[in-house]
Regions:
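Alpha/beta catalytic cores of nucleotide-metabolism and tRNA/nucleoside-modifying enzymes
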Residues: 1-21, 109-112, 177-178, 184-188, ...
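Catalytic beta/alpha-barrel core
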Residues: 80-85, 109-111, 131-135, 176-178, ...
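Glycine-rich phosphate-binding active-site loops on the catalytic face of alpha/beta enzymes
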Residues: 74-89, 256-268, 308-326, 362-396
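Short beta-strand/loop segments at the ligand-binding rim of alpha/beta enzyme cores
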Residues: 48-57, 103-108, 171, 228-237, ...
Length: 501
């Protein structure tokens, strides 16, 4: 006989946080939102990767491209570049993020003295970088012979056939720094010499990296930005359970920091096989998350398979209709609470903490705080990020209001059957997502800043200043439908919508 859960499953809007004691030290500016992204052992000082804010962007065509990945990394979160595209184009997006940043940057634009002005212009048009390294062999780590920047040429007064050697700034006129130079020292050299870029070279004068003035300004404006050991932005990527043996190597070559198996249902043999292949091929050096699941059995299955984090949620996304078309899923709050308990039990038994990601069901900003209090280490958001300037879809006018297009990976538009296919030879013939619009909301920075201020403020109401304390000390109450109505405005007439004449 089928098992019946004794209680209905619930979602975030059915819960409220009960205030706790707020001390003088508990103010929003002192709240830390740092949280682990990947698993770690008890007693280990730091996970291999942590987030500075508990936000990640969904593995979706209409959400996570390289532009949004850069913007979110500046805030301290991470994007997972969508996998429903060719291996080459996904790897190219990852590479753009890794080359964009900051600190010590491997040169992405390189030529030889024998190249021409036309080559310089073509390279600039291709990758958007205005600084070109001139090396003996035209590679990023060749012997440095000069630099070409936009100040070195005027298209209107030169011929496309002019050789680079005739207008580049030669090596003897360049200020450089040795390999052991720290980022602070490099920035000091840049400011003292009024430079826009500083080449870092080895003992044989081969180019190693550039340090750019603009990146110093960016870091000062974004103190929580998420960087790797080379001061490049962190970026993730979604994979499927079919072409992973060719997709993963290409993504790693492009510099990806973390992977996630993108699937509507993660409690499957195919996810286990994918994780096992990663562990056999790369050991623990490659970080890979898995999901989605909605109960303790699904979590333990993926944790024991070797997942670095586990995503929680089926059918709760605003564009997801998996529950409607297939009748599977669970209320997001109930699923999250159960999986969080399973994660804590697994940690007690094995000494390994496997972070969980709440994926779906976030409608209002306060839902973020509820999800974290219920045990989520971080959140994955689709609709939320799809509204911003940096997202991949255009801003359009619909019925007098600016909107952005937003569609699910299970929709006909995405046709990402590898995400929803259970592994058989026959492709699915129905949709599990819709094609829609979301209200345009402006730049990512302004919106994330406002949302996280609400999270920090609410945490202070609870009486905590970090996420682990929130998960330990928060008190939550299930509310009735009448209480939900009571929580909004009621028994009044709004002046803005019903002006008094």
């Amino acid at each position: 006989m089928a098992y019946y859960y004794p209680e209905p499953s619930h979602t975030f809007s059915e819960y409220l946080l009960v205030p706790g004691y707020t001390s003088e030290e508990c103010i929003p500016d002192k709240v830390s939102l740092k949280t682990p992204l990947v698993k770690f052992r008890k007693g280990q000082e730091e996970p291999a990767i942590s987030l500075n804010i508990p936000l990640t962007s969904a593995v979706m065509q209409s959400v996570s491209n390289d532009t949004l990945a850069i913007a979110l990394a500046k805030e301290g979160g991470i994007s997972f570049i969508f996998g429903s595209q060719s291996i080459e184009s996904q790897a190219a997006m990852v590479a753009k993020v890794k080359h964009h940043k900051a600190g010590f940057v491997t040169s992405a634009s390189n030529l030889t003295p024998e190249n021409t002005l036309a080559d310089v212009l073509a390279l600039k048009a291709k990758n958007g970088f205005s600084t070109v390294a001139i090396t003996h062999d035209g590679t990023a780590n060749g012997k440095l012979l000069g630099i070409v920047s936009s100040r070195d040429y005027r298209v209107s007064r030169m011929e496309p056939t002019d050789k680079v050697s005739s207008f580049m700034t030669p090596r003897e006129k360049l200020v450089t720094a040795p390999a052991e130079t720290t980022l602070k020292e490099a920035n000091d050299i840049i400011w003292e010499n009024k430079l826009n870029s500083l080449p870092i070279v080895d003992e044989n004068d081969h180019l190693l990296y550039f340090v750019f003035r603009k990146d110093y300004s960016s870091h000062k404006a974004n103190p929580l930005e998420l960087l790797d050991s080379q001061k490049r932005y962190l970026v993730g990527a979604g994979i499927n359970t079919r072409d992973y043996e060719t997709r993963i190597p290409a993504l790693l070559e492009a510099g990806v920091d973390v992977l996630v198996i993108d699937s509507s249902e993660g409690y499957t043999c195919w996810q286990k096989k994918t994780i096992e292949w990663v562990r056999k091929t790369y050991g623990d050096t490659v970080k890979i998350g898995a999901g989605n699941v909605v109960d303790r059995d699904g979590f333990r299955f993926l944790a024991e398979a070797g997942a670095d984090f586990v995503k929680v949620g089926i059918g709760g996304g605003s564009i997801c209709i998996t529950r409607e078309t297939k009748g599977i899923g669970r209320g997001q709050a109930t699923a999250l609470i159960e999986v969080a308990a399973a994660r804590d039990q697994y940690f007690q038994e094995n000494g390994v903490y496997v972070p969980i990601c709440s994926d779906g069901g976030i409608v209002h900003d306060y839902h973020m705080t509820l999800a974290l209090a219920m045990g989520a280490d971080f959140l994955m958001l689709g609709r939320y990020f799809a509204r911003f300037d940096e997202g991949p879809t255009p801003k359009i006018m619909v019925n007098g209001a600016y909107m952005k297009e937003y569609w699910g990976e299970g929709s006909n538009r995405a046709r990402n059957w590898q995400r929803y296919d259970l592994g058989g030879a026959t492709k699915l013939s129905f949709e599990e997502g819709v094609d829609s619009y979301v209200t345009y909301a402006g730049p990512l920075h302004d919106n994330v800043e406002a949302s996280l201020y609400k999270v920090r403020s609410t945490m202070c109401n609870v009486g905590v200043t970090n996420i682990p304390d929130l998960q330990r000390d928060a008190k939550l109450t299930l509310v009735s439908s009448v209480s939900i109505v009571e929580g909004g405005y009621h028994d009044v007439t709004l002046r803005s919508s019903n002006p008094v004449k």
